[in-house]
Design a protein with these regions (language model features):
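ATP-dependent carboxylate activation and anion-phosphoryl transfer catalytic cores
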Residues: 243-244, 261-334
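Extreme N-terminal starter segment of soluble prokaryotic enzymes
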Residues: 13-18
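Phosphate-binding site of ATP-dependent enzymes
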Residues: 169, 176-276, 301
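Short, solvent-exposed loop/turn elements at beta->coil junctions and helix N-caps
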Residues: 66-69, 210-214, 290-293
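Conserved N-proximal alpha/beta basic substrate-recognition cap immediately N-terminal to
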Residues: 10, 22-140, 144
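Structural detector of well-ordered beta-strand residues that form the stable sheet scaffold
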Residues: 78, 106-107, 133, 159, ...
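Rossmann-like NAD(P)H-binding beta-loop-alpha module
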Residues: 129-162, 168
Length: 334
């Protein structure tokens, strides 16, 4: 059953930009069951964007994407930020996206949103020449044993994840050793790897990727890209004994300086992505997060390119929020 959302006013022509969140984080975030520090970070991040939009002349406010009181048939703009429940409510979200995109300017472009929601986009980027973490794709209800894919690829340590999900939802590391297998995190029902795999592929299109040891040793680097330039970068590290770098699972994040080489790599990835978008008739991406890991040969590979609702860590670089607001102003005035 779809979750009900509060009623809040109307979308007021081109002067208003809605900063989209989810129901749990609307208002003061009191409906969330996450730790208060986590909620405070969400509110701070969105608040920095709202304030930046106000500084360039918009009437900006945060609302849940499912807010029943928003008139999407009026002119206006909406910016995806913390809409992290979309995969929990996929059918409802998809219907909303179809409706809103017919009446409202969305950032990023609705075509980009639809494309990037499904991790099969990695195939498209690889075809554009981007070095992507090697990935095997298994369709929902696909009768392919996990061990068979791993044997064919020569992988004995893999990450399995849904094609449509976020925050490491239903994501596991499966390691095969001479004396058996280890699954992290341990399945709550005690299932073995094949039982776990068949349960997941019964629900989702799935991805299988080799586990890259450097994500534990050094972490994952994320480059934040706003309207044509890398504004800042962070490094995410998993907590001891885990591989998931998300703060939902105890991971930590800090701002870092990155080499010119890495900035150029991120820029090149975004140029290739932008060409792909133009070829498909979409607007250029407004914002992105480029997530990179080193492989076992110390070469950088793209793990994900987040174009829907990435955390962009404006609290580490507030001027990037101003750059985002100015870019929105420029596009709406064009």
């Amino acid at each position: 059953m779809a979750q009900s959302c509060t009623t809040e006013g109307y979308l007021d022509a081109m002067k208003e930009v809605l900063v989209l969140t989810e129901r749990r984080y609307e208002g003061d975030g009191s409906l969330s069951n996450m730790p208060q520090e986590y909620v405070d970070n969400v509110l701070q991040e969105d608040g920095l964007v709202v304030d930046a939009l106000v500084r360039v002349g918009f009437a900006a406010k945060r609302v849940a994407w499912c807010n029943d009181g928003i008139r999407w048939d009026a002119r206006g703009a909406a910016l995806f930020r913390t809409t992290w429940d979309y995969f929990d409510r996929w059918e409802t979200f998809s219907a909303w996206l179809n409706h809103a995109s017919n009446h409202t300017t969305l950032f990023n472009d609705a075509g980009i949103i639809r494309w990037n929601l499904d991790k099969h986009y990695l195939q498209d980027l690889e075809q554009e020449g981007v070095a992507v973490v090697p990935t095997a794709y298994v369709p929902k209800h696909g009768h392919v044993p996990l061990f068979e894919v791993c044997d064919q690829r020569g992988w004995n340590d893999v990450v399995i994840k849904p094609a449509i999900a976020g925050g490491a939802f239903d994501t596991y590391r499966v390691t095969t050793r001479g004396d058996g297998q280890e699954i992290s995190p341990e399945p709550s029902n005690g299932s073995n790897s094949e039982e776990l795999w068949h349960g997941l592929v019964a629900k989702h299109d799935m991805l299988i990727q080799p586990f890259l040891q450097d994500v534990v040793a050094s972490g994952e680097v994320s480059l934040v890209w706003i309207d044509g330039q890398i504004t800042h970068a962070v490094k995410k590290r998993a907590k001891q004994g885990d591989f998931r770098v998300q703060d939902d699972h105890g991971g930590t994040v800090k701002r870092i300086d990155v080499s010119d080489e890495l900035v150029q790599l991120g820029t090149d990835i975004m140029e290739r992505c932008t060409r792909l978008c133009h070829d498909r008739g979409w607007a250029s991406p407004l914002y992105a997060r480029v997530d990179l890991m080193r492989d076992d040969n110390e070469a950088w590979q793209l793990s994900e390119l987040e174009l829907v609702e990435p955390e962009l860590w404006f609290r580490f670089c507030p001027p990037a929020a101003d750059a985002l607001a100015q870019a929105i102003q420029g596009r709406l005035q064009a």
